[in-house]
């Protein structure tokens, strides 16, 4: 039989046993993993943890505390959950998820936490900002009045966008949604190469849940067109963890807000928010939050509204900067009345609706002119464009009305035939090649010629040729008209007469 411990030894044995036990009182700052799986870790401890705080696991993986429940904390992982073991120690970092900001970000590609992924060395940030900041209040804002030119005739003429506006780009897959946003970024080059800071527009592009090849191609396009120097790309691709896809738009928004809050102008493209909603749904269901419509959580509207509300035009007292947002939403089979599309349509100040059918007909950009609107942009439209584009909307609407009849009979009256032929020509006029955005001074004369009937006798297939030669003719002979549109942004009655006679002269020789 084993000898009993003498009473004097008992205390020393107990002491040696107790020394082996970790200090349980320290559960305020650290915790232990209870279970891990599907990118979610449930942790016991971390009593002082804040919501959305960054935490670090012993294995080096980082995570964000989303659910603070009695007895445990639900943490989403920013990396692979294979590294994290049950019983592993987790510690607080004491900071909410923040990202590097400043002009040093320009020309860089970063991940959802703001770490560079382009192999160009560390980022020279001027500071850090919390990713999920609140939007500016009502008083620091002012209404939108400056144009944000996309370089696409169909957009600048019919659904003009102003600086500080939020314009949704919505359509099925492969209808050219990213192309519209990308052309807008490329179009800013003509101002960003100059020295006028008030005209410059810094661009932030967020890729959420896209293929890596697509993002690489996009960065390459920006570099080839020398547009990367004023752009920032934030990438959370399809292979990355859902929490990163959920966070990326907020990260990018914080980066773009630096420009807005320093009296500069920025543009942010969220491509696309459907993927962010899907990632957020995944997180919410794994964290066992109750599902709502289409199994999205109840606060998926708030997810998008708090993000898009951060795009704003600031008042002069607050620096007069602006942040314009172009969120992208992908619909399934043209269904605009699904949950996420209706949510985002109601949050934004208008939408550009792209249709697969138009795209296959060769009308590109495939903008459905009837369903696309801009709720605040007309106040910001270039005046010269407003002068010529007003009747364009009307003609296209009349054309859509009678286009249905056109299939039936040849015995249409003259005015209907006239409406049809002009409508076809205007539709042709609004087509545009990708990566070739046009300045407003090139758009206005062409649209002027279209709406005033100068194209009515030109064969449809020759319209692109007409457009090219007409602009060249004006540049050579009537430079002052183009100069006036570029500098003043409006056409006086003398210049309108001049444009009219120039157009007549050119059409006669064409």
From Swiss-Prot:
SUPFAM superfamilies xrefs: C-terminal domain of alpha and beta subunits of F1 ATP synthase (SSF47917), N-terminal domain of alpha and beta subunits of F1 ATP synthase (SSF50615), P-loop containing nucleoside triphosphate hydrolases (SSF52540)
GO cellular component term of the entry, any: proton-transporting ATP synthase complex
Membrane topology: Peripheral membrane protein
Subcellular locations according to the entry: Mitochondrion inner membrane
Residues that coordinate or bind ATP: 171-178
Superkingdom of the organism of origin: Eukaryota
GO molecular function annotation: ADP binding; ATP binding; proton-transporting ATP synthase activity, rotational mechanism
Keywords of this entry: ATP synthesis, ATP-binding, CF(1), Hydrogen ion transport, Ion transport, Membrane, Mitochondrion, Mitochondrion inner membrane, Nucleotide-binding, Transit peptide, Transport
Main localization (coarse): mitochondrion
Pfam family, any one: ATP-synt_ab
NCBIfam families: atpA (TIGR00962), PRK13343.1 (NF009884)
Function comment: Mitochondrial membrane ATP synthase (F(1)F(0) ATP synthase or Complex V) produces ATP from ADP in the presence of a proton gradient across the membrane which is generated by electron transport complexes of the respiratory chain. F-type ATP synthases consist of two structural domains, F(1) - containing the extramembraneous catalytic core, and F(0) - containing the membrane proton channel, linked together by a central stalk and a peripheral stalk.
Stated family: Belongs to the ATPase alpha/beta chains family.
Quaternary context: F-type ATP synthases have 2 components, the catalytic core F(1) and the membrane-embedded component F(0), linked together by a central stalk and a peripheral stalk. The central stalk, also called rotor shaft, is often seen as part of F(1). The peripheral stalk is seen as part of F(0). F(0) contains the membrane channel next to the rotor. F-type ATP synthases form dimers but each monomer functions independently in ATP generation.
Name assigned to this protein: ATP synthase subunit alpha, mitochondrial
UniProt source species: Pichia angusta (Yeast)
């Amino acid at each position: 039989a084993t000898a009993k411990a003498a009473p004097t030894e008992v205390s020393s044995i107990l002491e040696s046993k107790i020394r082996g036990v970790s200090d349980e009182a320290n559960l305020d700052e650290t915790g232990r993993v209870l279970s891990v799986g599907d990118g979610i870790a449930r942790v016991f401890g971390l009593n002082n943890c804040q919501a959305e705080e960054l935490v670090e696991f012993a294995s080096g993986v980082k995570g964000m505390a989303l659910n603070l429940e009695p007895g445990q904390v639900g943490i989403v992982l920013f990396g692979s959950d294979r590294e994290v073991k049950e019983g592993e120690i987790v510690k607080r970092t004491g900071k909410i998820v923040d990202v590097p900001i400043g002009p040093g970000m320009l020309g860089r590609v970063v991940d959802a936490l703001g770490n560079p992924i382009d192999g160009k060395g560390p980022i020279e940030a001027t500071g850090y900002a919390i990713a999920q900041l609140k939007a500016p209040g009502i008083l620091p804002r002012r209404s939108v009045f400056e144009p944000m030119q996309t370089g696409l005739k169909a957009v600048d003429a019919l659904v003009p966008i102003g600086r500080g506006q939020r314009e949704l780009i919505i359509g099925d897959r492969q209808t050219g949604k990213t192309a519209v946003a990308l052309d807008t970024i490329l179009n800013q080059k003509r101002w960003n190469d100059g020295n006028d800071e008030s005209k410059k527009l810094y661009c932030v592009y967020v890729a959420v849940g896209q293929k890596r090849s697509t993002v690489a191609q996009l960065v390459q396009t920006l570099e080839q067109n020398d547009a990367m120097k004023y752009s920032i790309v934030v990438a959370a691709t399809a292979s990355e963890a859902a929490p990163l896809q959920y966070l990326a738009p907020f990260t990018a928004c914080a980066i773009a807000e630096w420009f807005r809050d320093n009296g500069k102008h920025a543009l942010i493209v969220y491509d696309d928010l459907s993927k962010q909603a899907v990632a957020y749904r995944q997180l919410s269901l794994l964290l066992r939050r109750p599902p709502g419509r289409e199994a999205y959580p109840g606060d998926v509207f708030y997810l998008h509204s708090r993000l898009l509300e951060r795009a704003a035009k600031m008042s002069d007292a607050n620096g007069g900067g602006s942040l314009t947002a172009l969120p992208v939403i992908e619909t399934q089979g043209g269904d605009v009345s699904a949950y996420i599309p209706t949510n985002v349509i109601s949050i934004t100040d208008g939408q550009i609706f792209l249709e697969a059918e138009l795209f296959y007909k060769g009308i590109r950009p495939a903008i459905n002119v009837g369903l696309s609107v801009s709720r605040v942009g007309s106040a910001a439209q270039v005046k010269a464009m407003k002068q010529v584009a007003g009747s364009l909307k009307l003609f296209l609407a009349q054309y859509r009305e009678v286009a249905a009849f056109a299939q039936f009979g040849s015995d249409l009256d003259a005015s209907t035939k006239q409406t049809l032929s002009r409508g076809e020509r205007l539709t042709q006029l609004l087509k545009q090649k990708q990566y070739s955005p046009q300045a407003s001074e090139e758009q206005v004369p062409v649209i002027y010629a279209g709406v005033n009937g100068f194209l009515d006798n030109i064969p449809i297939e020759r319209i692109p040729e007409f457009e090219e030669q007409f602009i060249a003719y004006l540049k050579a002979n009537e430079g002052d008209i183009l100069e006036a549109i570029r500098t003043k942004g409006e056409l006086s009655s003398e210049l309108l007469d001049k444009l009219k006679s120039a157009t007549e002269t050119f059409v006669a020789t064409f």
